[in-house]
Amino acid sequence: MSSGFYNNDFKLNGVSYSLESLLLTANAVHYNLFEFLKEWTDKSSTIMLQTSGTTGLPKKLQMSKSKMILSAQRTGAFLNLQTGDKALCCLPLDYIAGKMMVVRALVLGLDLYLIKPSKNPLKTFSNRFDFVAFTPYQLEHSIQHLGKIKTLIVGGGPINEKTKKILYKNETDVYETYGMTETVSHVALKHVSQGKQEFKALKGVRFETKNNCLKIFCDSILTSPIMTNDVVNLISEKRFVWKGRVDFVINSGAIKINHEELENKLSKAISVPY
């Protein structure tokens, strides 16, 4: 079992637990959390993860718990998360995004509120959260409730241009994430509410390109670099602008047109879904 896997300041729904009592409570109230905690606290140094298919066909892979802890610490440092901060997990625990929200809370000593995923997770809450993770779909249906969040990360797909305009200069710090299961969740964040266009690497991460596609180097997490299908404009080894997927490029008379870039431009002129 990795050191740092459980912070004694961790709370679930505002209540402190010993590790043993946490397992008993999770078993009674949230089976998926219980199953994850059983695996997280066993003697194995790894945990089984299911990939979403970003870098190929969906598959299962064994991930080192120490690497998940390091990823949580790097996110905490980047976003200045503090012990006792209230965090909301409204993502499924089947995949890396939901699992890492739990890991961040366990490692950093956050007060975690865990609810069933829905399109508007904040609707039933009156209290304010310091840290929340959404999908773009959840974000689009929760705009009116963003005042309940201090820092929000959004992953699983790009935020559309219409929503970005709404978010610009919002009091909530909203970040779009870039990453995948193989990199233990995100390795770069884009500060959307400040109008930023580029993703900025977390500590220990750097980037290169090959044929305009992003290559990821991640100290202590990746044993070898990952070559992606993401077309980017590389600003530096720490920053890039995401353009789209190379497998979505349209070849029109030998002119390469990026599907996502075209969609972003059209969304500024077309107000109805297309």
Where are these regions (language model features)?
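AMP-binding/adenylate-forming
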Residues: M63-L70, K86-H141
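Conserved S/T- and glycine-rich ATP-binding loop of Class I adenylate-forming
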Residues: T51-T54, A87, V102, V132, ...
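Gly/Ser/Thr-rich phosphate-binding loop
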Residues: S142-Q194
